[in-house]
A protein has these predicted regions:
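A structural signal for multi-pass alpha-helical bundles of membrane permease subunits
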Residues: 1-251
């Protein structure tokens, strides 16, 4: 199994996803949550943007759409000939994108796929962080403002440490999603993309078991996938502990 170049590439793709997907998704989610909750006027009482409920609803909407529907929808948007994305870019004067294969080019296939997953998940984690930030006493932000801290300093030095445990939980969930990601990958690139550039272990496991009929090898792949998932979770807990997060149920 570990001498199979295709399996090793799928493992590498999973590791890339497990690193990039949580970082991008949580960064955007935290930035949007901070903007909505404490990103309003710096005058008077600390407050978020007006109509924040509307922004939360709109951002959360993609999360309630089934993953397979999202995959099919974006595969049509990315379509080289009749896709909406190429149509818009061409209309704006970018003629080089007239028939650009976003999912068919090895240079862009993984990035285009990650964008779709981030788009579908960022709203959920934004709402999660909004709820966590609202639990922080308003006096904490007021004191920071009186001391002269700006929005960015408040977000990084005050807000983020106080919701560290929420970030840890979100990171683990996103990591598990990245290590699976079967539905998104199968819908966007059923064959694993150009030169297997988007192939993940779950896809390789499915093909090995149900197309090739090699169930023993597929079980071994499943064990490797489970081990990688446990290792990822342990790594997140360890990093959080080293950075000063709570341990033993918040002790």
């Amino acid at each position: 199994m570990f001498t199979d170049d295709i399996f090793l590439k799928s493992l590498r793709n999973n590791i890339v996803l497990a690193i990039v997907l949580p970082v991008v998704t949580l960064t955007l989610s935290f930035a949007l949550a901070s903007l909505i909750t404490v990103g309003g006027s710096m005058r008077g009482q600390t407050r978020g943007l007006k109509a924040s409920g509307f922004y939360r609803t709109v951002s959360f909407f993609p999360y309630v759409i089934p993953a397979i529907v999202i995959g099919i929808m974006w595969s049509q948007i990315y379509d080289p000939s009749n896709g909406l994305l190429n149509g818009i870019l061409t209309a704006l004067g970018f003629e080089m994108f007239e028939s650009f294969p976003w999912l068919g080019d090895e240079r862009t296939a993984m990035a285009a796929t990650i964008f779709v997953i981030v788009w579908s998940m960022v709203g959920f984690y934004m709402v999660l962080f909004v709820a966590a930030i609202k639990d922080v006493p308003a006096e904490t932000f007021e004191a920071a403002r009186i001391d002269g801290a700006g929005r960015f300093r408040i977000a990084i030095s005050i807000t983020l440490p106080l919701i560290r445990d929420n970030v840890q939980t979100a990171w683990i969930y996103l990591g598990i999603l990245a290590l699976d990601a079967f539905v998104y990958m199968a819908a966007l690139n059923p064959g694993g993309g150009p030169n297997n550039s988007t192939l993940v272990m779950a896809q390789q496991l499915f093909t090995t078991a149900f197309t090739k009929g090699q169930f023993g090898l597929a079980c071994a792949m499943g064990v490797v996938l489970a081990a990688v998932t446990l290792l990822f979770s342990a790594l997140v807990f360890t990093v959080n502990r080293l950075l000063g997060g709570k341990d033993d149920g918040g002790r």
